[in-house]
């Protein structure tokens, strides 16, 4: 069950399994899952996964590493087969994004997510965003262009500027409440709301409630008396390290010159 318009999709979080299958996307093939008490996903070897625990606690089990015990507000990424196991009697819920490594831009870039665990998320973001909002980069792109996982913080009484994104934004409300404002209708948001903000391809428009044409994916977030914290997965980025520019090579100095500018000694 879902509530959808031309900008935004809200999913029912009471059922486990695949929520959104976009594995035919030419550039960024992904799948989106809701995992309840460890049920709802069968990971595939060779794919990458990003997850966020939004209720209860789980054991992240793999055959190659020690088990990790994660609780609400924690997150992870990895590129191997895994299991999410309940280790208490309480209900556990996890959203998982699967990146199809062998297709689209991911195949060209030979992408593979690193094994990382973090959290809990903080009360606010570390970076300034727009209209009083802040954000933090929870899992950074391994290299420029790769996916990333973000925390977006909305203080109370935020009325965001309408905007679009060039790729899907896959998210969940970690805590608090607010509203997604779109020309095609508004959608309430509360803790545990799973959603997708649709990408805008620069050419697709739809007729809105006022009878005018607006870009698909146009939206803004609004809060009143409550703060709201959102976890958002981006399938791509225009930020991150490259083979020519990264902290290790930038700050390696040869006769007063950064090794980043010395092509003759850079690893080929």
Per-region residue spans from a language model:
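A generic structural signal for residues embedded in beta-strands
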Residues: 77-78, 181, 197, 205
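Ankyrin-repeat and related helical/solenoid repeat scaffolds used for protein-protein interactions
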Residues: 191-200
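A mid-sequence, solvent-exposed acidic-amphipathic segment
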Residues: 149-167, 173-176, 180-182
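Short, surface-exposed secondary-structure boundary micro-motifs
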Residues: 81, 200-201
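Histidine-centered active-site/metal-ligand motif
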Residues: 163-165, 203, 219
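Intrinsic disorder/low-complexity detector
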Residues: 1-149, 155-156, 185-191, 207-268
């Amino acid at each position: 069950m879902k509530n959808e318009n031309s900008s935004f999709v809200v999913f029912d979080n009471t059922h486990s399994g695949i929520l959104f299958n976009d594995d035919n996307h030419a550039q960024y093939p992904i799948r989106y899952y809701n995992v309840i008490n460890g049920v709802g996903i069968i990971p595939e070897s060779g794919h990458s996964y990003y997850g966020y625990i939004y209720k209860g606690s789980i054991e992240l089990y793999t055959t190659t590493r020690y088990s990790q015990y994660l609780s609400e507000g924690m997150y992870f990424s990895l590129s191997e087969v895994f299991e999410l196991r309940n280790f208490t009697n309480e209900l556990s819920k996890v959203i998982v994004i699967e990146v199809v490594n062998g297709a689209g831009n991911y195949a060209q870039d030979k992408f593979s997510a690193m094994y990382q665990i973090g959290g809990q998320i903080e009360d606010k973001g570390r970076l300034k965003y727009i209209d009083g909002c802040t954000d933090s980069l929870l899992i950074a792109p391994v290299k420029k262009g790769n996916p990333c996982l973000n925390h977006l913080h909305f203080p109370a009484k935020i009325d965001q500027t309408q905007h679009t994104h060039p790729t899907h934004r896959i998210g969940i409300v970690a805590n608090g409440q607010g509203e997604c404002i779109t020309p095609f209708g508004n959608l309430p948001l509360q803790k545990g709301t799973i959603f997708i903000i649709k990408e805008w391809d620069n050419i697709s428009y739809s007729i809105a409630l006022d009878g005018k044409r607006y870009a698909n994916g146009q939206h803004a977030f609004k809060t009143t008396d409550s703060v709201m914290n959102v976890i958002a997965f981006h399938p791509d980025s225009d930020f991150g390290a490259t083979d020519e520019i990264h902290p290790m090579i930038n700050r390696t100095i040869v006769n007063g010159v950064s090794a980043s500018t010395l092509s003759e000694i850079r690893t080929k």
